[in-house]
């Protein structure tokens, strides 16, 4: 499906694009923190130069009050950023033009589809196969794929795309520990997805088969749909108890993050993209423990109290349902 030397192609294209100025690498510094109570390890990356870069551009309006379509950066991607112009037939594989981590990839649909659409079986399998090709277990190089679905998920572009980036060396997302040693299963009314009871925000995880030969479109699709049904039930519960708050267009669109490694698939329902005090925005990477900070005052708060990271993640998501008895309503 992909060139056998894909990782080498990515690295060479990235290095050339940085050298020629087509990729604008964001300088940053990183520090590891741990919320002992929740058992979550965080890597907090401080990138103050991003203060001037908006998370998501507001909708522009013309003189008649009609919305002006935003430019689609994926419609005609720069050749210097293109890894594969034809990836599995329906996609292009590109470099992120403004990465904080080296070799940050974007898997974008050739056809214009909306970022509010769920992942298709082919989206899932293509992503899994890319993770297979990019990971190097001998060198402890692992990758995280993620999808920010909906305005409150932390998405910044409306053209459907997934992203893939290398995990920091020896970094262990909480999903690793949650899924370690467990067999794959399809969640249902009798068997809930895995959640860590110590973590206060809802996160629905399922281990994937250890044998990659057992991972196909059907297995990934059934797993994803089951997790999605459980995730969407959170919004039904929330809208029922917050009817007066449901008039906001963006708030009424279900938003969630999808996170995937070769070992597991995880969905996190999202209530909003930004926490206000201190100021910080999260996309899917935050819910793997990779947190990006732009402001000194935010960094100071997190350094002084790592549990503040977990509280901010909860503010932008929903409370955990660990231990709650599932019903047919949730599936």
Swiss-Prot record:
Cofactor(s) this protein requires: a divalent metal cation
GO molecular function, one term: ATP binding
Positions of disulphide bridges: none
Name of this chain's protein: Diadenosine 5',5'''-P1,P4-tetraphosphate phosphorylase 2
Recorded catalytic activity of this chain's protein: ADP + ATP + H(+) = P(1),P(4)-bis(5'-adenosyl) tetraphosphate + phosphate; sulfate + ADP + H(+) = adenosine 5'-phosphosulfate + phosphate
Subunit (UniProt): Monomer.
Functional note: Ap4A phosphorylase catalyzes the phosphorolytic degradation of bis(5'-adenosyl) tetraphosphate (Ap4A) into ADP and ATP. Can also use other Np4N' nucleotides (where N and N' stand for A,C,G or U) as substrates. Cannot catalyze the reverse reaction. Additionally, this enzyme can also catalyze the phosphorolytic degradation of adenosine 5'-phosphosulfate (AMPS) into ADP and sulfate, the reversible exchange reaction between inorganic phosphate and the beta-phosphate of a nucleoside diphosphate (NDP), and the synthesis of Ap4A from AMPS plus ATP.
């Amino acid at each position: 499906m992909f060139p056998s030397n894909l990782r080498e192609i990515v690295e060479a294209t990235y290095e050339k694009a940085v050298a020629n100025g087509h990729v604008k690498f964001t300088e940053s510094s990183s520090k590891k923190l741990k919320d002992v109570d929740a058992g979550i390890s965080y890597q907090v990356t401080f990138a103050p130069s991003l203060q001037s870069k908006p998370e998501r551009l507001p909708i522009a309006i013309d003189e008649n009050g009609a919305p002006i379509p935003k430019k689609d950066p994926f419609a005609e991607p720069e050749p210097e950023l293109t890894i594969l112009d034809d990836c599995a037939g329906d996609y292009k594989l590109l470099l992120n033009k403004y990465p904080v981590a080296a070799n940050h990839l974007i898997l974008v649909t050739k056809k214009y589809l909306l970022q509010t659409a769920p992942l298709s079986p082919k989206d899932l399998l293509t992503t899994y196969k890319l993770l297979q090709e990019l990971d190097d277990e001998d060198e402890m190089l692992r990758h995280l794929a993620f999808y920010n679905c909906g305005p409150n998920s932390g998405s910044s572009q409306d053209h459907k795309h997934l992203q893939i980036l290398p995990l920091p060396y020896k970094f262990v997302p909480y999903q690793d520990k949650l899924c370690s040693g467990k067999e794959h299963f399809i969640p249902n009314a009798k068997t809930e997805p895995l959640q860590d009871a110590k973590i206060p925000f809802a996160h629905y995880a399922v281990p994937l088969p250890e044998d990659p030969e057992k991972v196909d479109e059907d297995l990934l699709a059934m797993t994803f749909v089951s997790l999605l049904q459980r995730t969407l039930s959170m919004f039904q519960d929330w809208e029922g108890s917050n009817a007066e708050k449901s008039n906001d267009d963006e708030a009424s669109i279900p938003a969630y993050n999808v996170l995937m490694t070769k070992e597991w698939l995880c969905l996190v329902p999202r209530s909003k993209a930004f926490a206000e005090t201190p100021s910080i925005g999260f996309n899917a990477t935050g819910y793997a423990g990779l947190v990006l900070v732009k402001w000194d005052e935010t960094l100071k708060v997190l350094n002084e109290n790592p549990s503040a990271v977990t509280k901010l993640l909860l503010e932008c998501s929903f409370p955990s349902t660990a231990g709650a008895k599932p019903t047919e309503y949730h599936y």
